[in-house]
Amino acid sequence: MCVCACARVCVYVCTRHHPPLDVFPADDVITPPCSSWPLRGVMSRPACQCLRRCEVMGEVNGPVCSPEIVLASAGKTLSENGQENSPHNSDSGHETSSPDSPLTPIEEGAVSPGDDSFFVVWIKFMVLPRKLCINKDVEKLFSAAEKTGNDGEVLCPSDECDTFRIRIIAPGAEPFDLQVNSNEMVQELHQVLLEREATCHRTCFSLQLNGVSLDHFTELKNISGLTDGSVLRVVEQPYTTREARIHVRHIRDLIRSLDMSDAVNGTDGASMSYLASMTLGDRKKNADKTLECSPPDYVLPGYKERPLIPLLPVMKEPVLALKSLAISPFNPPPGHRKLKGDVLYLTFDTREGRRYHITCCTKGFYVNATTEAGFRPTPSPSHRTVHHSLLDLLSSISISFKRAMALILKRRSEKHIFERLPTPYQVNSWIAPVFEQIEDGIRAEDCTQPHKIGLEDHIPGQIRDWNEELQTTHELPRETLGERLIRERAIFKIHSDFVSAAIKVNVSMAVVDGNVVAINPADEPRTHMYIWNNIFFSLGFDVKDHYKDLGGDAAAHAATSNDLQGVRAYAQLDNPKLFTLGMVIVDYKGFRVTAQSIIPGILEREQEQSVIYGSVDFGKTVVSSEEYHDLLSKPAEQLKILPHEVHSGKDDGKIIKLCSSFETKGIVGNDSRHYILDLLRTFPPDVNYLEDAEVTDICKANGYPRTFPHKLASLRQELIDAFVEYRYLMFIRIAAYHVQQTKLGLLETDYNDDKKETTKEDTVLKVTGFSEDAIMSQIKREITADIKIDEMPLLETEAAKKIMEEVIDSDHKKVDSLDKEISETIMAKAAKAVGSIRMDAFDVRFNPDCYCSTVRHAESEDITKQRRLVAEAAEFLIVQQLPNFVRDCLQRTIMLLDGASLIDSLHSRGINIRYLGKLTKYIQNVGQLSYVKVICITELLCRCAKHIFRGYLQPVSSAHTAAAVSHFLNCLLSSSTEPLTPSNEEVSMPINSVKKSRSSKRRKQISSGGKENDDWAQMSSHKLWERVKSDADFYYAFTIDEENIDAYLSTVGIQKTSFLRRFVQIVGIQMLLRDYNLESGKKSQLFVEDDIQSLYCQAKHVDPKAVDAHSLFLSGQTKVQQGQLRAGFDLVLESLNLMNSVYGAMHSDMAQCMRLLARLSYILGDPSEALSQQHKATLMSERCNGLDSANTIIEYLNLAHFSFANLHIAAALKLLYRARYLLLLIHGENHPFMAEIDGNIGVILYAVQEFDDALKFLQNALKLHQIYLEPQALKTALIYHLLARTYSCRGDFRTALQMEKETFTIYSKTFGIDHEKTKESSDCLKHLTQQAVTFQKRINEANRQGSNNIGQLLPVEIHRPSLHSVLEVLNILNGIIFIQLKGISTSSDIGEENYELGNNNNNNNKRKKKAVEDLAVKKNGNNDDTTVISSRPQVNNMSGSSTVQVMQEVALD
C-alpha cells in the first residue's frame, strides 16, 4: 500500500544515515488540521520508503508503493560506497554491528515455490480473540490478499503513484539522483537532505526549480514543470533567531549522536540497545573457534551469582569533538547590531584550549573579535569567512573538531536506524552506568530556566493548547481508510507528546520538586493544584475529605486509576460527539500526580455552574441533561451500563435518569464540546472487597467479602466483557434446551448419543493426558467448597447454536416455526436465568451505583437484583477466570517470565492484582507451575513493599533521598539491617569497592539532618518484614510464616537479584551498574547511597491503537492458522505498513508484526529475510520494551534460530547465551523456557563438537523437561536422544545406552513396538551397543599391549552432523516442523495419509502454497503440546539421516 498517499505521516525505516530526530525546522512540520495544531519534528518523517529507492536499492523502474517494496527498503544496511552486505556476498564475513540484511524475495526476483511441497507446523500456542471486527476497507484488503497468487501483492486502496527521477544539487556536495513519486510533498525532500551524510548539517534552505522556491506542503504532482530529469537546487536561506537556534541545536545533536547519556537518563525518547554491540557478521568458518563458542561462566547451568555488568553494552571511549558550545552571555544582539544582521552569539571552546566567540548573522556564521576583555561583534581579522553551516565553521577553526566530527559521523552512519529513532513513550532502565558530566550549555539552559518548557524552538507560536489538539484530532474525518490513518496518526502523535510533556517537564522538574507555584498556594500543600504548560496537575490525596467515607487517601489514590480505566473505555468507543480529557497518571518519589488537559472555560466559573450532568457533591444532589442522556445511551449499551433512576436530592423531588454513574460529570466547554470526566465508577464494584456486601455462597466459602483499604475496588472491563459473553452462551444454551424439549425431541436423543461419544473421548484424553484435569478438578473443588450448585440441564454450545439457527431459519421461512407465545416464553425463561434486563432478548447490564449509599435510588429500581448480578460477576472471576488462567499456564498457552508478563496476562483476562494471593494459593502445590508460583510471590512481595515505600519516601527531604532509598533497600533485601544512627559503625564500613569516603559523606548527611524529618532512618529489616507480612495478608489474603526475608526467599526459591529488579522497576529507582553479589548470602550492608543513580517517573495513560492495522494483523494470524501462509504473510505485511503510518517506525506492536513476518519468511523458504525481520523486531523490542523484558528474551531466541539458518553459527550462540543470561537475571534457572534455550544451545554446541559444554546444557534441559513437562513427552524423548548422541561422541557408551533406552521406552509407550520411530530407536540402541563392544575391545587390546596411545581409544565413528540436520532439530525444538509431501491429498483428514520426509538440503526448503492451503489443520490432545498426524512419526537423527517427526499444533507463537 502506498502509505504516502494515505497518511503522509509515516516514519520511514530504511537503514540509512539519519540525523537525530528530536529537532527539526518547524517548516518541516506536516500541515495541521487547524492553525492551533503545531507538531514537533518527529511528526514530519517522510511518508513512504519508496522515496529513497534509488539511493537504497539503486532501482529505477517498478512499482514503488507496494508493501513489499516499502518493507524491502526497511532492512538494508549500506556500506559507505553504497554496496549491500548480504550474507551471500563474499565480503560479508567481517564484523558488523548488525546482522546482514538480505534481499527480500521481490528484490531477488523470487518466483513461486519450487516442486517440493511441504506442510509447515508450529508447535507454539497463541490464543486469538474470539471476535474479530473488520471494517469495509480492511475487508477489501483481506479479500485482495485472498485473491492474490504467489506474487503476494496486496491491492492498494489509494490511487497509484507515478514515479520519476529528479536530480538535486546541494552546495558542497556531489549532485545525486532521487526517485520520487508524485504524491509526495516537498518537505519530504527536505527530510532526505537532512538524512544524507553530506547534507545532514544544513537546516536553513529551500528547494528551487528554475529559480522558483517550492512550498513545503505542495505535492510534487502539483508543481508545474517538475518532470522526469528535472533539477532541484538547494538554496541557502537567511537565518532568523528561530532558525539559528534550531540550527545550533541540530549541530549539537549531531555532535552528541554517540552519547548514551540521554538513553541512560531516559530523555527525549532515547533508550538503550544491546544487540548492536554484538558481532553478528560471522559465518560458518568461525564455528571452529573455541573462544567464539564457549559460554561465559555466568550463563553455565548451576552458576549461582547473577552479575549485572553484562546487562548493558560495554561503553566505548567517548569521542569528544569540543569542550563546549553554548549561547553567549552577550545575547541578545544590541539594536545597532540587529540593524546590521546579527541574530545570535555563541561561544565555542575547542579541545585545543581556545575559546572563540561566534556571530550568527542572516548570511551565516563567522568568528567575531570578542575577547575576554570586551565585546567586539565585528568579524575576527584571522577568520573572516562566513559559513552558512556552523559545522563548516567549527571544522575550519579546529583541527581536533574536524577529525572527531568525521569519526562521529562515520560511527553514526553505522548505527541501525532503530537505534536512533525515539520511542513513542519513554523507556527507563532500572540500572545505569556512571557517566561523567560534560559541559553542555544548551542542556543547562533547558533544564535550569523555570520558564522554559522545552518547546520554544520547535513551535511557531505560544505554548501548545493540549486540549484543543486532542479534541481536534478526535474530530478528524474517519470515513475512508486514508482518513482513518491520518486521524489515528494524529491522535497517537498528540497523545505521545502530551504524555512526554506531563512526565518530562512538569513532574520530575516542577510539581513534585516544588518548582511550580500552585494556583492555591494558601491551602495545605497536599491539596495544591498546578497549571503548567496548559496541563492541570493535582496530587493523589484526599482533598477536603471527599473520600473520607471511602478510604481517605487510599481511595483517592485508587480513584485516579479507576478514572483512567473509564477514560480508556470511552476512548475506545470513539464517539465523535463525546469528548474525554487527556489524562496521565504519574508516580514519582512516592507521590501520585494526575495530569489532565483543561476544558475551555472550566477555570472561569464554579464547578456547580459548569456541571450539567451528574453530581458534584458525591450524590447528594444529581442533575441530568437530555443532551447527555442521548450522548451516553449508546456508550452505556456498549459498556454494559444499566440506565437507572435516582432522586435528584433537591426540593423538587424529581427522579433523574442516568446512563452512567452519578460520579460521571458532564460539562459543556466554551468550545461547545460535550465533555465527560470523573469516570471512576464506570465499571461495577468488586463486592468481594466491599465490606458488608452480599456475595454468593461460593465467594463466602472463599473468605469474601474481605476488608480492603478503600471501597473503590472495581471489576475490570475485560472481566465484564468475558462475563457477558459467558452469559450470552448460557442464554443460547438454555433457550436451545427449552426449544429442544418443546419441539425437537428426536434431536435430543441424537444429541445424547453424541454426548456419550464425546464423553468417552474425553475419558480417553483424561487417561492419557498430563494430570491437567486432576489439577483443575482439585482447584474447582477448593473454590466451590463442595457447595451444591443448582444447574439447569444445558446443551453444548455448538449444538445449541445449531438448534437456534434452525429455529431462526424456520421463522424466516414461515415454515414449521414455533408458536409465538411459546417462543416468547422460552426467551423469557432464558433471559431470566442469565439476568437479562429484557425478557424478549439478551441484554445484561450493570448498575455501577447499586452499592453507593450517598445517592438515593428510585423506588422503581430493583436494587436487590442488580446487586445479585454484580455479585455473580465477582463469583465468575473466582470460579471461571482464575481456574482458566491456571489451565492456560498448564497448557502453556501463556508463557510467564516475570512480573510484568504476569500482570499483563492477568489484566487481559479481567483479573485484578488483588487476587494474586488467591491465585498463588491455587498453584502452590502444583509442581508443573512452581515457576509461576515464584513469579506470583515475587510480584506480591514487591507490591507490598511498594505500598510501604510510598509512605516511607514522601516525607523525606531531597538531601536525604538517596540515603533513605538505599536504607530501605538494605532493610528489604537483608535480615540484619538496623536503624541508622550517627554512631552506627555499619554506616562507615566500606562495601566491596565503595570507598570509605563515600560512606563517611553519608554519615555526615544523616547526622546533619537537624529539624528535618528523619523517621526513615528508624526503619529496620525486622520492622519492614513485619509490615510486608501484614500487608500481604491485608491486601492479598496471603499468609507468610517465616521470620525474615532471607529464609522466605530461600524457601520459595526467589532470587534476590530478580526481586531487586522487579521492585526498583515498579517504584522507579535507577540503580548503579555494578555487581551486588546478592546471592552470596552475605550479611553485611548491600547498598550505599551512591548506588542510587536516580528516581524516574512511572506513567499510566491511554495507549491509542491503530485499529485497522490491528484488524489486519488478527486476520493474518487467522489465515496462518488455517494454513494459508502466503495470504497471512501479505495481511501481516500490510498490517505493518498501516502501523508504520500510524505509529511511525518505532512501536512494540510493530515488533510483534515483524516477529510473525520473520517466522513466515522462514517457513516460506527465505531464511535471510527472516533474519532481517527478526533482527529489526529484536532491536525494536529492546528499545520499546526494555533490554531485559520478557518479549526481548523471546526475540533473542528467534533471532538465534534464524542466525543459525543463515550460517551465523557463533552469532547464534552469542544470542542464545544472551537470552539465557536475561532469563537467569529476571527469574532464575528453574523455568520451562530455560529448557528450550538450553536445548538450542546444546544442539549447536554438539554441532561444533563442544561436547562437554553441550552435555551441561542438554542435561539441564532434560532436568527441566522432567519437572515442567511430562517425563514421557516426545520432546523429552528427543532430548534423551540428543544426550545419547553426545555421550557416544565422548566415548561414554554406557550412559549413551541409558539415554537411548529412555527414548525407546517413551516411543514404545506412545506409538507401540511396531512403529517406525520405535524401530529407529531400537536400531540406534543396536548401533550404540556395537560401538560400545568395539570400544571395549580396543581398551582391552590397549591394556594387553600396554599402549598409551589415546587416539586408538577414541570412539569408532564420530560423524560431524550436517548443518541442515542440526537446523531440523532446532526447528523441532522451536516449534517449526517441515513435512515434505510426496503427494497432495484433497482430503480434509490428513491423518489418513502417510507422508514421509526424505533427505533434503537447504536448497530444497521451498513449499508450494497450494500444498499448504489444501491441508486441513487438525488438533487433538496428545501430550507434550504435540499432535501426531502421520502414523509414522520420526525423530531427527543427528548423525546425518534427515527424517523429521511429523507433528502439528496450534499455529502461532
Curated annotation (Swiss-Prot):
Pfam families the record matches: CLU (PF13236), CLU_N (PF15044), eIF3_p135 (PF12807), TPR_12 (PF13424)
GO biological process: intracellular distribution of mitochondria; mitochondrion organization
Protein's UniProt keywords contain Repeat: yes
GO cellular component: cytoplasm
Protein location: Cytoplasm
Polar residues: compositionally biased ranges: 78-101
A GO MF term: mRNA binding
Domain (Clu) ranges: 439-690
Annotated disulfide bonds: none
TPR repeat placement: 1235-1268, 1277-1310
Keywords tagged on the record: Cytoplasm, Repeat, TPR repeat
Bias-annotated ranges (Basic residues): 995-1005
Parts of the chain that traverse the membrane: none
InterPro entries per UniProt: CLU-central, CLU_dom, CLU_N, CLU_prot, GSKIP_dom_sf, TPR-like_helical_dom_sf
Positions of the UniProt region annotated as Disordered: 78-110, 979-1015
Keyword Repeat: yes
Similarity remark: Belongs to the CLU family.
Function: mRNA-binding protein involved in proper cytoplasmic distribution of mitochondria.
Protein name: Clustered mitochondria protein homolog
Organism of origin: Brugia malayi (Filarial nematode worm)
